[in-house]
From Swiss-Prot:
Entries under PANTHER family matching the protein: OS08G0158400 PROTEIN
Signal peptide: 1-21
GO molecular function: FAD binding; oxidoreductase activity
Subcellular localization: Secreted, Cell wall
Protein name: Berberine bridge enzyme-like 11
Sites carrying sugar chains: 52, 136, 273, 482
Organism of this sequence: Arabidopsis thaliana
Pfam families: BBE (PF08031), FAD_binding_4 (PF01565)
Length: 526
């Protein structure tokens, strides 16, 4: 018995030593020396391990969510910031030899930090050096690298044309890679659909380092999957070829806020019927936030109707007076501007801000953040709305964005791309909780508030499954530490509905060993 115990202890010590050596940064660097065609330049210029003085700076550069920027947050074994696509093959060759995961970071806006952290040992490939945007006015298209931000993309388009744009997100520091691969919506989705509905080509690298430079070489199945199915489950998308869309020389934006005492309830009730059925050139978003009341410590809900119409003052007022006269929109509430300037408006910049600010990929104010999402298929009743507004005041910290669907969104079949939330949806809800105070107990409190409000909203939103939007990633709806099919189906059905099974089949075909995985990746079928 004593001899058996000694043998077991020796075996365990050997296994531990082997595991530690396989996840040691220096061992990884030696592997790169073997695999890299020009290892000296490769290692010194684009690879960072914890002993490098720049490691922390490089890691934190694209972490906007302070929840995942703490001393206790798991850090990568190494960060690779390739400057050419040929740098990636040796990284993948070494990664296949190590018992580790690979995370791909575009802009770092994954709300659960899955693009740059992991509970398992991992390498991080950061695409921040890939930010080329090549606009082709003759074709009306552009090739955009996945490390570019939406702001950089918008700026480059407007640099070439005042009458072309692209339907994508409001936050200009979002990385193109994560945004498009999750669906990507913005103020023109009722007119032109999502970002993925306007992608016509892609380039991708698989786990073996093979590069597919166009749609034909990768095939229609893989091309379908990386347009809304979460590209990080299938490989490293190098770039997307996008179709640019016509925009008028002038668009009109407006923002009108009303409290309950100023008639907000009636306006919200009308908004639920108007926003998805009005002219598709018009997008009117509703935000529900808290403001101070007249008495000390009193809080009340402010409903803000923020809109953009693809047209000038007259067209905007005509449509609003016809379809939403209750808001009593006036010309003085509106501002005419170029489409590129509306990008700044939606991003929260003051009118007149130079467009060059879009070239700054840095998040100016970092916060602790939690996001959740829902889909609404029938109008919330007046009674239900009253309860929702009351709950917002009770919890104090939760805010809501209601984003209208309809128009083009209702015409595209749910199976056209992996993003399934099409016809039948009135609007999408984004739940927002941001805070600045540090501390584990503070974080637990706010996460509990988010979950409490999410449970409270159950009667008013979709069910079986309760649908969710991948770009508002929420680990609470399900996760899989082992990327199993059974666990993956729990969150997969919510993000992708019936499209989940097709994604699993494609994943199994193109990544049978499940090399590309995270806590909410597409699993393989076993």
């Amino acid at each position: 018995m004593e001899k058996l115990l000694i043998i077991c202890m020796l075996l365990i010590s050997v296994l531990v030593a082997t595991s530690q050596s396989q996840t040691d940064p220096e061992t990884f660097l030696r592997c790169l020396v073997r695999e890299g065609s020009n290892p000296q330049v490769f290692i010194s210029d684009v690879t960072y391990i914890p002993s490098n003085s720049s490691f922390t700076t490089v890691l934190r550069r694209r972490i906007p969510n302070l929840r995942f920027d703490k001393p206790t947050t798991p850090k990568p074994i190494a960060i690779i910031t390739p400057t050419t696509w040929s740098h990636i093959s040796p990284v993948l060759a070494c990664a296949r030899l190590f018992p580790v995961q690979v995370r791909i970071r575009s802009g770092g806006h994954d709300f659960e930090g899955l693009s740059y952290t992991s509970t398992a040992p991992f390498f991080l490939i950061d695409l921040l050096n890939f930010k080329s945007v090549d606009v082709n006015l003759t074709e009306g298209t552009a090739w955009v690298d996945t490390g570019a931000t939406l702001g950089e993309l918008y700026y480059k388009i407007a640099e070439k044309s005042n009458v072309l744009g692209f339907p994508a997100g409001l936050c200009t520091t979002l990385g193109v890679g994560g945004h498009i691969s999750g669906g990507g919506y913005g103020t023109m989705m009722r007119k032109y659909g999502l970002s993925v509905d306007n992608v016509v080509g892609s380039r991708i690298i698989d786990s073996n380092g093979n590069t597919y430079f166009d749609r034909m070489s990768m095939g229609e199945e893989l091309f379908w999957a990386v347009r809304g199915g979460g590209a990080a489950s299938f490989g490293i998308v190098m770039g997307y070829k996008i179709r640019l869309v016509p925009v008028p020389e002038k668009v009109t934006v407006f923002s009108v806020g009303k409290t309950v005492g100023e008639g907000a309830v009636d306006l919200i009730m009308k908004w639920q019927n108007f926003s998805h059925s009005t002219d598709r050139n018009l997008f009117v978003k509703l935000t529900l936030t808290l403001v101070n009341g007249a008495k000390p410590g009193e809080k009340k809900v402010l409903a803000t109707f923020i809109g953009m119409n693809l047209g000038g003052f007259d067209k905007t007022l005509n449509v609003m007076n016809r379809d939403f006269p209750e808001l009593k929109l006036k010309k003085t509430d509106c501002t005419e501007m170029r489409w590129i300037d509306s990008v700044l408006f939606w991003a929260g910049y003051p009118v007149g801000t130079p467009t060059s600010v879009l070239l700054n990929p840095t998040v100016t104010k970092k916060l602790f953040m939690k996001r959740k999402s829902d889909y609404v298929k029938r109008p919330v009743s007046r009674t239900g709305l009253g309860l929702i507004l009351k709950k917002l005041v009770e919890l104090e910290k939760v805010e809501m964005n209601w984003n209208p669907y309809g128009g083009r969104m209702g015409e595209i079949p749910s199976s056209r791309t992996p993003f399934p939330h099409r016809g039948g949806n009135l609007f999408n809800i984004e739940y927002i909780i941001d805070w600045s105070e540090a501390g584990d107990n503070v974080e637990k409190k706010y996460l509990a508030l988010a979950n409490e409000f999410y449970r409270f909203m159950t009667p008013y939103v979709s069910s079986n499954p309760r649908e969710a939007f991948l770009n508002y990633r929420d680990i609470d709806i399900g996760s899989s530490g082992n990327s199993t099919y059974e666990e993956g189906k729990i969150y997969g059905a919510k993000y992708f509905k019936d499209n989940f099974e097709r994604l699993v089949d494609i994943k199994t075909k193109f990544d049978e060993i499940n090399f590309w995985r995270n806590e909410q990746s597409i699993p393989v079928r076993k």
